A protein has these predicted regions:
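Catalytic adenosine-cofactor/nucleotide-binding cores of aminoacyl-tRNA synthetases and other
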Residues: 1-84, 186-207, 211-223
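Secondary-structure capping and boundary motifs in well-ordered enzyme cores
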Residues: 3, 14-15, 44-55, 87-99, ...
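Short hydrophobic "helix-edge" motifs at membrane interfaces and signal-peptide entry regions
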Residues: 8-10, 102-104, 162-164
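Short, charged/polar, low-complexity loop and linker segments
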Residues: 36-41, 100-108
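Basic, alpha-helical terminal appendages of large translation-related enzymes
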Residues: 37, 108, 112-114, 123-225
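Short, hydrophobic, well-ordered secondary-structure elements
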Residues: 53, 57-67, 119, 123-126, ...
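Conserved, charged catalytic cores of large soluble enzymes
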Residues: 60-106, 126, 130-146
Length: 225
């Protein structure tokens, strides 16, 4: 980049337009630490709309909206059992295992200063959580009054979001704090430790969620390019 060519990126202008967290996210994902990288508003907007709005934002919004709709905003108890034998729920167990297993690849990536790879491990979990919603179709569970399975599905999603927020905090602190508050977790996310908060079960059933506005409203390309 060169001032004489007029292609210098003003970070303050980018932050004013897109926000600090999306800009940080883009740089971590697109630019290897310590190396040169390319920046374009088009690429940032694509990351914003695809990764942040569609993947993460929709996962939080859909999960909390269903908890509001089906459980009056109260995090359901996944241990509720039907009178008959519990039906296995492989998808929930798989997502739980993946959320619990983020730490190994995440820690190794940080040791190597591979911040993009660290975020990749978190995004793999986000993508699988979205797939879990489509596979289990909670709306159909509600229609058939399968509240036991619905409880387990929605608790699994909400607890996965809690763990995701913990891992995102070093990279996107404002976003992680918003997720934390919408899950209505009492303690400050800035004071948590990965070793403790990455363990499954930190979100207590019976917690009243506080769903807020969309984390990342989609950007209309023609208004920003």
């Amino acid at each position: 980049m060169s001032k004489s060519f007029g292609n210098v990126v003003d970070p303050h202008e980018v932050i004013d337009t897109f926000g600090a967290d999306p800009f940080r996210y883009f740089l971590f994902r697109e630019v290897p630490f310590g190396l040169d990288g390319d920046f374009s508003r088009h690429a940032l907007i694509k990351r914003f709309n695809t990764d942040l709005a569609n993947d993460l934002g929709n996962l939080l919004s859909r999960t909390l909206s269903m908890i509001e709709k089906y459980f009056e905003g109260i995090v359901p108890d996944p241990s509720l059992q039907a009178d008959d034998a519990e039906t296995p729920l492989p998808g929930a167990l798989q997502l739980k295992h993946q959320a619990e297993s983020i730490s190994s690849a995440f820690d190794l990536s940080l040791e190597k200063l591979s911040f993009g790879h660290a975020i990749d491990t978190v995004w793999d979990t986000i993508n699988n959580a979205n797939k879990f919603i489509e596979d289990e179709a909670p709306w159909n569970l509600y229609k058939t009054n399968n509240m036991q399975k619905l409880s387990r599905v929605l608790y699994t999603l909400a607890e996965t979001l809690r763990i995701i927020a913990v891992y995102l905090f070093p990279f996107m602190p404002s976003t992680a704090e918003k997720m934390w508050k919408q899950l209505n977790l009492a303690h400050d996310i800035a004071g948590v430790t990965l070793q403790i908060e990455s363990q499954w079960g930190g979100l207590r059933p019976g917690t009243k969620i506080c769903k807020g506005p969309a984390l990342f409203p989609r950007i209309e390309t023609d208004k920003t390019l």
